[in-house]
Curated annotation (Swiss-Prot):
Name of protein: Putative L-glutamine:3-amino-2,3-dideoxy-scyllo-inosose aminotransferase
Catalyses which reaction(s): 3-amino-2,3-dideoxy-scyllo-inosose + L-glutamine = 2-deoxystreptamine + 2-oxoglutaramate
Residues found modified as N6-(pyridoxal phosphate)lysine: 199
UniProt GO BP: antibiotic biosynthetic process; polysaccharide biosynthetic process
Functional summary from the UniProt entry: Catalyzes the transamination of 3-amino-2,3-dideoxy-scyllo-inosose (amino-DOI) into 2-deoxystreptamine (DOS).
UniProt similarity note: Belongs to the DegT/DnrJ/EryC1 family. L-glutamine:2-deoxy-scyllo-inosose/scyllo-inosose aminotransferase subfamily.
One MF term in the entry's GO annotations: transaminase activity
EC number(s) given by UniProt: 2.6.1.101
UniProt cross-references to InterPro entries, sorted A to Z: DegT/StrS_aminotransferase, PyrdxlP-dep_Trfase, PyrdxlP-dep_Trfase_major, PyrdxlP-dep_Trfase_small
Family matches, as SUPFAM superfamilies: PLP-dependent transferases
Pathway field: Metabolic intermediate biosynthesis; 2-deoxystreptamine biosynthesis; 2-deoxystreptamine from D-glucose 6-phosphate: step 4/4; Antibiotic biosynthesis; kanamycin biosynthesis
UniProt keyword terms in alphabetical order: Aminotransferase, Antibiotic biosynthesis, Pyridoxal phosphate, Transferase
Length: 419
């Protein structure tokens, strides 16, 4: 291996990309062919074979009483909020440190997203900030289980019960993670999951909704199916303006295999994450976000998040170090992964198009609209995200990651002098 940094003309540690596509199971092609042979591609309304089978399989593994697959994990949030009774002008509290789709789902139903700061230890929504933000217009709290973390569901449940609010868990990262032995997504009044192409379980696109209450579930079903009723249920037909958020039989058939493979892949990621954390601890400067909270009885590893310590890198900024590691063929992500919502270029929300935000935010929701110092610092200076694709390969993949980081650390003076 060249000891000279690739950033300055040396040979990179790795030239091949990590595989980040879906993992194909032994029965996936047979299931997809069965859909093609059937000529029946639609997913809902029931009874459609693979959608029903997948919904039963997924909700059964989650321990949820009701659930349905939808077209993606953003519209699922909008549907859930409507099903929970959120109306135009209502306020929904969520974290400022998440993919902007969490907040966009609130805006798209003409409700007002109230962005609050994150807990400095877990980087999930701060319960104290949630309670401080509650007003008479607040209807729902939307925590996000970020990366391999879980929001403090005990504290959030106590706050919600105290103030008569609902909880919608954004579980796009947390498939089958567990809090006190119960899957996340099932602790709140509703839960939303994503099967987008980067997720640990994917059909290219797709989402899933779970509910604790049958009426909420029936509202979800109607809202996802153009306002129609489920056969045999007429509680909402004719009174609900819905979306076409239906997932197809092809997506549902493929997702059955994703559930079947999950536990084996999860075990691989968990072992790799432990080895990576131990290896980075020896190198120094990367500390895992979070703590050993005993209430987290199973983590998920969509992303493992580390906190960068500039003191361990002679004052270099995180982005300088990550750029050098990237040149070695290893992509560890910083603020490009998740800028705070109010600083995301994709979160284009102004009062001309969305007048309900004007009273709280003025002309637009932008960089100066809210003060979220912990989220801002995490995104701009501290966060290092390791995608699950880097954790699902073989020992060589893991070795390449650690070798690249160590190589940059060994050439720290050269990097520092060039900064």
């Amino acid at each position: 291996m060249s000891k000279k940094l690739a950033l300055f003309g040396g040979t990179p540690v790795r030239n091949e990309e990590f595989y980040d596509g879906p993992h194909i199971g032994p029965h996936d092609l047979d299931r997809l062919k069965s859909v093609l042979d059937s000529g029946n591609f639609g997913g809902i309304p029931f009874p459609n074979t693979h959608h029903t089978a997948f919904a039963d399989l997924f909700t059964g593994k989650l321990g949820a009483p009701y659930g349905l697959m939808v077209s993606n994990g953003t519209i699922s949030l909008s549907i859930a909020l409507r099903a929970l009774g959120v109306r135009a002008g209502d306020e929904v509290i969520t974290t400022g440190y998440t993919w902007m789709g969490t907040a966009a789902a609130i805006v798209h139903i003409n409700a007002v997203p109230v962005l609050v700061d994150i807990d400095p230890t877990t980087w999930c929504i701060d319960p104290a900030a949630v309670e401080a933000a509650i007003t008479p217009r607040t209807k729902v709290i939307v925590p996000v289980h970020l990366g391999n973390q879980i929001a403090d569901l005990d504290a959030l449940r106590a706050i919600a019960d105290k103030h008569g609010l609902a909880i919608l868990e954004d579980t796009a990262h947390g498939h089958f993670a567990e809090w006190r032995g119960q899957c996340v997504g099932t602790h709140g009044d509703a839960g939303s999951f994503s099967f987008e192409s980067s997720k640990i379980m994917t059909a290219g696109e797709g989402g899933f909704l779970v509910a604790r209450d049958e009426d909420v579930y029936q509202r979800m079903m109607s809202l996802a199916n153009c306002g129609r009723k489920e056969p045999g249920y007429d509680g909402f037909a004719g009174r609900t303006l819905g979306w076409n958020a239906r997932a197809s039989e092809l997506q549902a058939a493929f997702m059955i295999g994703q559930v079947e493979q999950h536990d084996a892949l999860h075990a691989k990621r968990a072992a790799s994450a432990a080895k990576l954390t131990a290896g980075l601890a020896e190198i120094g400067g990367f500390t895992p976000v979070g703590n050993d909270d005993p209430r987290i009885t199973r983590r998920q590893y969509y992303e493992v998040i580390y906190r960068f310590d500039p003191a361990a890198w002679e004052g270099l900024h995180r982005d300088e170090v990550l750029s050098a590691i990237l040149a070695e063929g290893i992509e560890l992500e910083g603020d490009a992964f998740y800028p705070p919502v109010h600083k995301s270029e994709l979160f284009a929300v102004d009062a001309v198009h969305w007048p309900m935000i004007a009273e709280r935010y003025g002309d637009r929701i932008g960089p100066d609209s809210v003060d979220l110092p912990v989220a801002d610092r995490a995104a701009a200076d501290e966060s290092v995200w390791v995608h699950h694709a880097l954790l699902t390969g073989d020992d060589k993949d893991l070795g390449d990651i650690l070798e690249a980081v160590a190589k940059v650390r060994d050439n720290l003076r050269e990097l520092h002098d060039a900064s």
